Regions:
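Contiguous hydrophobic segments
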Residues: 391, 448-463, 568, 572-575, ...
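Extended amphipathic alpha-helical segments enriched in small hydrophobics
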Residues: 378, 382-391
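Metallocofactor- and cofactor-centric catalytic cores in central/energy metabolism, strongly enriched
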Residues: 154-158, 162, 393, 570, ...
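Generic secondary-structure boundary/loop-capping signal
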Residues: 130, 321, 376-381, 566-572, ...
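Conserved catalytic cores of very large enzyme subunits
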Residues: 2-376, 397, 401-554, 558-561
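Long, charge-rich boundary regions
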Residues: 540, 555-591
Length: 591
């Protein structure tokens, strides 16, 4: 037994040092380092602890054999992701934890920005994934006014924020996964509210400070459009912009900056409040919503990364549709298997919720306990992976066909019906998410290959993967509008977490072209959340180049090729084998 344990731990350490196996590159935000090694080894121990001590044997076997994926097992004692109330931070200050240094509420812009950085860094240690604030520009604008700041002074503080959030600050040598949502135009639900400065309400209203909000937006965009000294993009915070009816007519000078950043790096995420049925005010609605109607699914406020105030997810389980299609052989048996594994997912999420509530009550999440106190407004999240491959397996046609579209729409609607039943049974919130599946799609494919001879997979024999959620095959088309049309109904069937990435071979020629494209997508489709994602390359010596350039044309050195892995920009060299193959096979759109 001792010899076996020694060999197991030796293999575990060697796996990371050699960067071998899917677990070694499970998260491209974690950089190769001693801290990464410690994270890798401890994550394996904590993951095993969770599977054997928290979850049922049925859930453990379903996960181990690839029927489901229980996300972030290393963080099984804490929640998945969270959106926070910036207003509460500005009112209360930073602290509330016994034995830890506390600060008074911010009286000045520089202090407020510093508190945001502190808060995100600390909360990222208490949760598995993304941490988000909404209305960053609106809520901090009054501080700029009362401090009588020049634009240069605002720029300096925003520059500090961006650089601070791009430094590793958690085990695994990870940058804090953070999102800031910018209103662009003062949000109607905040416009008539009294501003918070220095921990107290003042007589002034937020609608009076659009000019200062514009300064904050300009400063942020001018920082990120330059990148770092070598031309690398800033991965975090992920900026989300709310596209409302006046979005394209407001802030003339900032429009050019925003779409220069979009054309060059593709950093901004766009939340579509024009073509979709989303409500901009819902971002803060969960804070005071005490009585949920569990007879229907509600759309989770925010989006995949930018969760609404005081909401988020306690945990995520993804279902392997490809495996169920392979074993089911026909649609009726497929649905029966789906129902079975949805129940297993539900049971595991109910366990997770109880564990997180206990962790918070016992002080394992001390800052979350102070600022949140409960996860009653946090969702239990279920997602799917391999929808395209499931179509091929069941009906011999992929997701781009009418038959494939019909099958997956029926599947998603069936899942939603089951989630309503779960809500009625548990009195907890459930949602259906197009989960990112950064490592899950590769892990599922490896296990499908192991257990299911002849099963349909994307990629190659050496680097297989499943297509994310119910997305189109990555090599299906370079026609953007065809792809958008085929994703319109599918993406709006989910209740959270959908993103459509407009992948481009290189940056767009000018900002006006980017603006026109974003406007057209927002006005003519129902897609809730989308990005423009150009490919670009960075040489440590000679800077940035358009498109995929693996060798620097000036010095001949290796470059870093950048694109989005499921939702954030990272060098392709940091991706796992499955996602790397997906990048190689992907057709970029012509615009």
């Amino acid at each position: 037994m001792a010899r076996k344990s020694y060999l197991d731990f030796t293999a575990l350490v060697d796996e990371y040092i050699r960067q071998d196996g899917w677990k070694a590159k499970t998260n491209s935000n974690s950089n190769y380092s001693l801290s990464g090694l410690i994270s890798h080894t401890s994550a394996s121990v904590l993951g095993k602890y969770a599977l054997y001590n928290l979850y049922s044997d049925e859930a453990r076997l379903a996960h181990d054999r690839g029927f489901i994926h229980i996300h972030d097992l290393a963080h099984s004692l804490v929640g998945y992701c969270a959106g926070w109330s910036l207003q509460k931070l500005l009112m209360d200050g930073f602290g509330g934890v016994p034995g830890q240094v506390e600060t008074k509420p911010a009286h000045h812009f520089s202090t407020a920005v510093q508190h945001v950085v502190y808060y995100i860094n600390v909360m990222y240690q208490e949760w598995a994934g993304a941490q988000a604030f909404s209305s960053f520009d609106t809520l901090l604008a009054p501080f700029v006014h009362f401090d009588h700041l020049t634009y240069r002074q605002v720029f300096q503080e925003i520059q500090k924020l961006v650089h601070s959030l791009n430094l590793p600050s958690r085990w695994g040598f990870e940058m804090p996964f953070s999102n800031l949502t910018f209103d662009w135009i003062v949000s109607p639900d905040l416009a008539e509210q009294n501003v918070v400065v220095g921990g107290r309400l003042r007589k002034e209203k937020y609608k009076e400070f659009q000019k200062e909000a514009d300064m904050i937006n300009r400063a942020f965009l001018e920082v990120v459009v330059k990148g770092d000294k070598n031309g690398r993009p800033f991965t975090f915070p992920i900026p989300t912009y709310n596209i409302t009816k006046d979005f394209f007519e407001a802030n003339g000078e900032n429009q050019e900056l925003l779409f220069k950043v979009t054309a060059k790096f593709g950093l901004p995420y766009f939340q579509n409040y024009l073509g979709s049925n989303l409500d901009p005010g819902s971002i803060r609605a969960m804070c005071c919503r005490l009585n949920m109607n569990t007879n229907e699914l509600i759309r989770q406020p925010g989006n995949l990364w930018a969760k609404g105030d005081s909401t988020g997810s306690v945990g995520v389980v993804t279902i392997n549709l490809n495996r169920l299609a392979y074993l089911g052989k026909n649609e009726k048996k497929f649905q029966k298997l789906l129902q079975k594994y949805l129940k297993i997912a539900k049971d595991s999420l109910e366990v997770k919720r109880k564990v997180v509530e206990k962790s918070m009550a016992d002080g394992l999440m001390p800052y979350s306990k102070h600022y949140l106190g409960t996860v009653r407004n946090h969702f239990s999240t279920i997602g799917v992976c391999g929808g395209n491959e499931a179509c091929v397996t069941l009906i011999g046609k992929d997701l781009s066909t009418p038959e494939g579209q019909k099958l997956m729409l029926q599947t998603l609607r069936f899942i939603k019906e089951e989630l309503v039943k779960f809500q009625k049974e548990t009195k907890q919130l459930y949602n259906l998410e197009a989960t990112p599946a950064e490592s899950t799609s590769y892990r599922f494919a490896l296990l499908d290959k192991k257990y299911c001879p002849g099963i349909t997979l994307a990629g190659s024999k050496e680097a297989p993967y499943l297509t994310n959620s119910t997305q189109l095959p990555v090599d299906f088309t370079d026609d953007l509008w065809e792809a958008l049309n085929l994703q319109n109904d599918l993406q709006t069937t989910y209740t959270c977490g959908t993103i459509f990435h407009i992948f481009l071979g290189e940056e767009m020629d000018n900002w006006k072209q980017a603006r026109t494209l974003v406007k057209k997508v927002a006005q003519t489709t129902k897609i809730p959340y989308f990005t423009i994602t150009p490919t670009f390359s960075v040489c440590m010596t000679d800077g940035r180049f358009k498109g995929k350039v693996e060798k620097c044309p000036k010095c001949g050195g290796e470059t870093e090729v950048y694109s989005r892995i499921v939702g954030y920009l990272r060098p392709v060299s940091r991706w796992n084998k499955g996602k790397d193959m997906e990048f190689k096979e992907r057709k970029t759109f012509k615009v």
